[in-house]
Amino acid sequence: DANLRNQMRIELRRLHQRLATTSIYVTHDQVEAMTLAEKILVLRAGNIEQYGTPDDIYLHPASVFVAQFMGSPSMNMIPATTDGEKLILPDGTPLSGVAASDIRLAAAPSKDVLVGLRCEDLLLDPEGSVQVTVDIIEALGPDTLAYCHPIAGKAGGGVSDQSAIIVRLPGTRRPAPGDAIRLSVRADHGHVFDPASGLRCL
């Protein structure tokens, strides 16, 4: 069960620290990978997708695959375009919060991109550029997960993707299903990916 798996991870970590030897541990469990490893090698169809520390993998994913595989819930992916200076949602609303250097690296003007946003990097903000409607609330004690869908075509809404947008909120903040909320992006915490290749725009 879950408690047994948690205890096993702790025991494996203790064993690794006590032996002080290089160990290779193969797992499909991202929590095991993040908590046990000093370095992670992410494989996709037998090919190396990314190699780095757990922080590297989580904070600077090299591709959409890595971004959505590592981390629970998976990273949100929002379609946008860029003119090389700013990110623009489908209704023309600018999306702030992504580092200017990442936007410039997205290359050609008016290029289609995917903006990756971790659920903890989306903030409730009455002036936010992303407008969504709350579908489901998961109350997890210290945290609340809000599963939302985009409101397309409205001022300040602009996200046309139909997949869920997941927002992590403090446990005491619980909007009701059906509520319309606005979100902004934590400064410099967005990621820009090429939708054709799936690679981070580097």
Task: Indicate residue ranges for each PLM-predicted region.
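Non-catalytic connector elements of ABC transporters
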Residues: 75-77, 86-202
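Beta-strand-rich soluble domains of envelope-associated proteins
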Residues: 39, 57, 72, 137-140
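Residues that scaffold the ATP/ADP-binding catalytic core of kinase and kinase-like folds
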Residues: 7, 60, 68-69, 125, ...
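C-terminal boundary and immediately downstream tail of ABC-type ATPase nucleotide-binding domains
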Residues: 60-83
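Residues located in well-ordered beta-strands
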Residues: 53, 65, 79-81, 131-135
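Internal, well-ordered alpha-helical scaffold/interface segments
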Residues: 55, 64-68, 111, 120
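ABC ATPase nucleotide-binding domains
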Residues: 1-65
